[in-house]
């Protein structure tokens, strides 16, 4: 039976001849609709379309792979019914070359196919983030040096920029502004035009009227939101004064003042608004009567004072200057903004030169080059399609765009230029409420523009279709989400009105659950009081009153996170103890909840995820956190970076203590305390110098440190940073040391990555340790952490801890959204120069001669707009988080003072159905929004009662359950539960009465035989070589007892006798050279020889290893057809590690059937693979000695290994391995599988 489509889904699948915008809510089946439309086009009886005539653009490579798979599955299903349909069979063949891809990949194809239209080397490659950041830093340094050296008017403008925005000590702040602004400008379709237009806005003419400018319009909008909030505050006071005896005069005065404030909301003209607000005066209040309620009088007087202060602040901030003075301020900014624009253009030119020299392009270049190829600019400046664009218009019958709400301006320009106009052929699907990538320059206004202009009527050229039926979530989840967002989401904040059209409609079908089971249920709201835990009674009073330093604040933050994590852990355990069940579509039945059904979502994972992971693990809950971070926080990297900092400047106490405490010098805590006591006023370094005069063990350690440091400092002066870094690894023995630590292989790999970064750094004009340390610090900030992603399959039985952004597109039966009390990040609002794609540049006004600065009126406008858009994005992030839930939604957040917060939420909800934009804008966290939205709900009565709040109840179909927690109780509860009073338990036992029973139980346990004993001896992990040996052993009838053989450990180097390299060691050397060879360089005998010499110099190879490498055989490989194909590929990967999960019965064939679900992780390293247009080519090198006539035997021996490599590679890349080879270095044979 086929899928039962709704009428709206059918319309989206079958409508032709229009541009279609499908607004698809969370869980509405948009991907299924998109796939069905493609299948519908392919199988159309009257006008069938070949799959390679469609362009399908997805947001990620994973989404593209999934789309391709879904289309393939659908085609195969149809073919099963129509096996004779040759055209349909051909579509499966065409599917491999169909353009189902990300926009970046499509643009890259355009550039590679048309590079000759650009001044571009056809052998270009895409630089990684580190490489391009280094080039940008190098270009900016060189540019600044050139600007300082100039002797013309450009230098004057540049020096004004440095004085205004460079920072207090150097010009670093200006360099940061340049790089940040350059990145933004390059995200726009026509960056130079944008810059020119923006600078011209500061060139104000005599007829310029600020009061009608776009900046004035934005500021007036912001002030109206502010005034509406002030008015509501006044109306609360008016309401409190009603019928208050003795305060009638107050009531009339407050009413009059509220009316005057309300009048401001009607003015859309700057001057009218200014005149009215300037005229507002707060006259002296009349005397209160003798019978007046003093509490009410004091409360309303405080409200009035706050209102007066707010009105005064608005007057002084925006209306103290005349429009002429504002005009002069903007005019004064023109020359400095012009100098900034010129600097950006000069930087762009220099950065392009650097990239050209390296033969690389960056990710922004891909889209810009594609746009350049696809467009032609005529004399009037109009943009027209080029011949290439017209070719694509002809080629693509329809253009599909998934996740359309996340498109940016340049992507929209590209897709528009290749789309047909008659008949229109665009199909765009997305949900603007899930647009959460503005930080990547995604622009939801692109979606809004079409949403507001497209028609719901069929047959229109531009048509929209609404899919708002949710097939994912239970009714309890949907009603709670609707209840929250109808209160807080609006056109101004959230950027969409949450109307009846936008709300989620229940469409899922959940069967009736079994009796005595727990399913679904009310949405839970867990509020945690973040009060400070009281000290133990025996602690001294003065210790309680000490001021908190940074470390204590950090500990408090960790405590707060721990408390939330423990609350979450407790709730997860309750789900299992209460027989909570979920509906499993695969088995079409209910089953007990599993750990894999649960996800914990966090807005930010950097600090939170590790704490949650630890707490859940300690609670006995298997958990996994895929943060994509952690590289710079690993022990080995922190230690080495600290060491480099100390070598550069030993006067830094924190890095120095880290190095002294590390295994490199192994100072004990007692010794470090002794050092500190040497001289409390001096630095640690000075204390070490003083301690080195001592005649004890500490003195010896201190002297050794100083001697070693001096030696390293001398070497650092003349050695390149990469060589010096490798020298440190070897000299300290730290590289070998970390190998013996847990995850030693990973730790060594981390150190090698740092070495590679140093190598990249040395290829630039930067030199020296100081600059390298600065570069690493910049890398942390600019490119984020470099943690390697960990892969967990969807069926792994663990609770996932992930960011809300990573959860987008996923769904889970149980969703726990934690950290809801965490404050929003608003740091972007406090940059010296703000920027906005519509409003332009917003600089600080700086008078560096008088040493004063303040936000310009332009900056105030942009600041408000950025805040508005940032909070709109946060609202959509919250929407994404809540809509991941299928059956159970649990919300967790902390607040410093819950009663105070509840009163704040009640004030926000007291006067109107919807929470005001003022209260939304002034909300500090998700919890402020949720609290204000739900506080009037009937189920929130216990919370209102707790806070002493009286508020009219609101009826709603949603169901809520509130639980209050206290930080102190949560922290102490765990400590209490960890202690077991064994004595009391023993006392309670009647040993005589139960002796025989205990005896029997002891005997039963001693004689117990575990039924799955063999599983205990199965290895958790095997190498590919071990798997090959086990499977090949079947021919000699080996059984699984071989898994119990003793592991033969490698003899340590210091115990080995020197006797030359073994065959295995020679093979390792050969593989190392094949891994490290630069394939872009000369690969003749001389070229290979020179590269090997360089590897020895950099201590990648030893002299002994280098002598054993047969360069003739390496050259021979590259002369083969296989080697030539590898060199011509644009994507070659070498030494790729992998893990793959296999059933134990696939490896140990004699295991019984009950071991089918016992899995073993198989690990290995793929020597090499490269990509061609139609798939991947896998190569494994072998250095074995091969007897004459034994080639086929070799091929058979490694068959299992090659198949495992192929399977792993397809899993990793999502691409088909089309060819598999072994290359035998011994005789140059190529064995194909």
UniProtKB/Swiss-Prot annotation:
Question: Biological process GO terms, please?
Answer: double-strand break repair via homologous recombination
Q: PROSITE patterns of this UniProt entry?
A: UVRD_HELICASE_ATP_BIND, UVRD_HELICASE_CTER
Oligomeric state and partners? Answer: Heterodimer of AddA and AddB/RexB.
The EC number on file is 3.1.-.-, 5.6.2.4
Binding positions (ATP): 24-31
Superkingdom, natural source: Bacteria
NCBIfam families according to UniProt: addA_Gpos
The UniProt record lists the UvrD-like helicase C-terminal domain at 518-809
The record, for InterPro entries, names: AddA, DNA_helicase_UvrD-like_C, DNA_helicase_UvrD/REP, P-loop_NTPase, PDDEXK-like_dom_sf, PDDEXK_AddAB-type, Restrct_endonuc-II-like, UvrD-like_ATP-bd
- The parts of the chain that form a coiled coil are none
Q: Which PANTHER family match?
A: ATP-DEPENDENT HELICASE_NUCLEASE SUBUNIT A, UVRD / RECB / PCRA DNA HELICASE FAMILY MEMBER
Where do the record's region annotations for Disordered lie?
533-555
Q: Which gene encodes it?
A: addA
* A cellular component term, taken from the record's GO annotations: DNA helicase complex
Q: What does this protein do?
A: The heterodimer acts as both an ATP-dependent DNA helicase and an ATP-dependent, dual-direction single-stranded exonuclease. Recognizes the chi site generating a DNA molecule suitable for the initiation of homologous recombination. The AddA nuclease domain is required for chi fragment generation; this subunit has the helicase and 3' -> 5' nuclease activities.
Know the name of this protein? ATP-dependent helicase/nuclease subunit A
Q: Spell out the reaction equation it catalyses.
A: Couples ATP hydrolysis with the unwinding of duplex DNA by translocating in the 3'-5' direction; ATP + H2O = ADP + phosphate + H(+)
Q: Does the keyword Transport apply?
A: no
Q: Which cofactor does it need?
A: Mg(2+)
| Alphabetized UniProt keyword annotations | ATP-binding, DNA damage, DNA repair, DNA-binding, Exonuclease, Helicase, Hydrolase, Isomerase, Nuclease, Nucleotide-binding
Gene Ontology MF, one: double-stranded DNA binding
Report the sequence similarity comment from the record: Belongs to the helicase family. AddA subfamily.
Stretches assigned to the UvrD-like helicase ATP-binding domain:
3-474
Q: Read off the lineage from the record.
A: Bacteria, Bacillati, Bacillota, Clostridia, Thermoanaerobacterales
The keyword DNA-binding is annotated on this UniProt entry: yes
